[in-house]
Amino acid sequence: MNDYKQFFPWFKNNKDVIYLDSSATSLKPQVVIDAIVDYYTKYSTNPHNTDSNFTFHTHEIMNETRANVAKFINANFDEIIFTSGATESLNLIANGLRPHLKKGDEIILTYIEHASNLLPWYKLRDDLGVKIIFANQKNQFPQLSDFLKVISPKTKVVSFASGGNLIGNVLDENLIIKNIKKIKPDVLVCVDATQSIQHRMFDVKKCKSDFMVFSAHKLLGPTGIGVAYIKNDLIKKMQPLKYGGGMNFSIDLNSYQLYDNYMKFEGGTPHVAGFYGFNAALKFLMDIGYNKIHEHELKITKYARDQLALIPEIKTYVQDATSSTITFSYNGVFCQDFANYLGSKNIIVRSGLSCAKIINNVIQTECAIRASFYIYNDFNDVDRLIKAIKEYQKGDELNGIL
């Protein structure tokens, strides 16, 4: 098995720490860190300044990053909009559709969504009177049939996560979108790929998604930069979320005219260093290849599931064999307390519902522990986790607190 840890300086600085929280944010390879440092130490110019060969370099990196993102998901260059992250991307899309929605229109979501794919649509419900419909039934993981049952003449938008934030479920966006559009071709579909694009390939042309969102920091890139993919014909119809320099081609005392392409969504100076880091992360991932990444993750996660299944006190939730996330609880111990105990053993996990607060309608718990694996995890990480769980004694969760 490849030692991917060697590419991540975090492990050199934290030799005794096990990192199992990649669903929250990924660690960064040295090439990403170097690219960001290069920007600040060698360039540090604004990408909108193209008046010299020196400043043009940063403009080229911005364009190269956009081109690589487009290649990454098989989109067109001018369908990629840079944002601060998936949260802003979802807000941008919901707000952009505001003029085209009215009272009584229906937006379909699921119980497994992150708050970022709930609140922007809830805001439209509060402001416009649109109706929110949840596809899946309580106590059930969403299935294709759930989406198809709730499609109606009033359905305008379907927005769902292709990978669950908490329980690591995987939805087949190709199958779901294909069948939704068979019933209602004009419905707009948004895929939140934030928790899955770091693990598998996406093809927006194949799946025919109208929108897709994700964040760079989940796939080895820097924080503060993300992507909203929007189909070209929709970009022209949507209003911007924010207004500022660079998005208009004319302005006077009484009027202004915006570009009718992706530029109208990118007012102001962007996260320039983020372009450098994100571009390096994309190249790093493409050099390794998703087949190797997925194969590596499956081996590690299967081993972890098999080992956890041997511990009577452990309960796991909605296990998807293709997911790199495992959600569990320890019988009789509050999840945050047990996560604190693991933390005292230098094992980083996440407790709670991880911003997917309404998921308790599916898994019937108010608190769980999430261990999420990525390319830099190995069997030793799993062994350390299992050893710590087996060594737990009642009261150990209070270590370091009292």
Swiss-Prot record:
The protein's matches in PANTHER family, at most eight in alphabetical order, are given as: CYSTEINE DESULFURASE, CYSTEINE DESULFURASE 1, CHLOROPLASTIC
The UniProt function text for this chain reads: Catalyzes the removal of elemental sulfur and selenium atoms from L-cysteine, L-cystine, L-selenocysteine, and L-selenocystine to produce L-alanine.
Catalytic activity, per the record? (sulfur carrier)-H + L-cysteine = (sulfur carrier)-SH + L-alanine
* A molecular-function term among this protein's GO annotations: cysteine desulfurase activity
Task: From the Swiss-Prot or TrEMBL record, give the protein name.
Answer: Probable cysteine desulfurase
Q: Which residues carry this modification: N6-(pyridoxal phosphate)lysine?
A: 218
List its EC numbers: 2.8.1.7
Q: Which organism is it from?
A: Ureaplasma parvum serovar 3 (strain ATCC 700970)
Entry's family note: Belongs to the class-V pyridoxal-phosphate-dependent aminotransferase family. Csd subfamily.
Which keywords, in A-to-Z order, does the entry hold? Pyridoxal phosphate, Transferase
Q: Which residues form the signal peptide?
A: none
A Pfam cross-reference name: Aminotran_5
Q: What EC class is this?
A: transferase
Named cofactor requirement(s) = pyridoxal 5'-phosphate
